[in-house]
Amino acid sequence: MCIRDSIHFGYSIGEKHAGLLVKKINAEDPDLICIAGDIFDNEYEGIKNPKKTAAILRSLKSRYGVYACWGNHDLSEPILAGFTFRNAKKDYDDPRMRNFLESANIRLLDDETVLIDKRFYLTGRKDPSRCRKMSDTRKDPDQLTAYLDKTLPIIFMDHQPGQLDEVAAAGADLDLCGHTHDGQLFPLNIITGLIWENSCGYLKKGTMHNIVTSGAGIWGPNMRTATNSEICSITVHFYPARPNSSDPS
């Protein structure tokens, strides 16, 4: 499976970058593609040719489809010199973003869970920062897993790598995150390591595996000085749960 995060389609990233992503992801021949938020860079108007960009993304190929959750930049806010500012009108919801995903054949999971191939669950969480600005609420991890069959593997997509203990306690086996860009610019790469328990890479939390990707795009200045953009390719093996164990690995 492939996970990508923080593409930030907008003024700096558009159809050319989309084409490169599609080419690299399809080369991995993934069974599942997960986009862990920040598909957009706030101002939808920044995408030069959204119809063409969505058409390019429709070329993504995987056995089980392409799924996404929202990130903190997936709402309408003005941008100046690469940085976002408060929306004075507080009209954060831009329906064009949802329409873009539908046109690109990307299924949004907004505090929702799907059972894939009757073999495993995929849950996409709402982003907490986005919820605060939009006066929305998101479910706790245990609410999202309360009615799931815990003998099947449960995969979470959560843009920000917070609540790792809560997600693990709720029964998730794999937690896919992004948001941090692994700092992107020096010395932010040092600071993110102090803010987040896992700012980039792999961490095992109890029986849960947490993976945080540095992201495929950029935020703010159109550069990276301390980290690399990436598409994260993950190999997952499903094994029958051991007796009296909730760990499927």
Report each predicted region and the residues it spans.
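N-terminal low-complexity segments that are often proline-rich with Ser/Thr-Pro
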Residues: 1-3, 248
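Soluble catalytic domains of enzymes that build or remodel membrane lipids, polysaccharides, and related
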Residues: 4-244
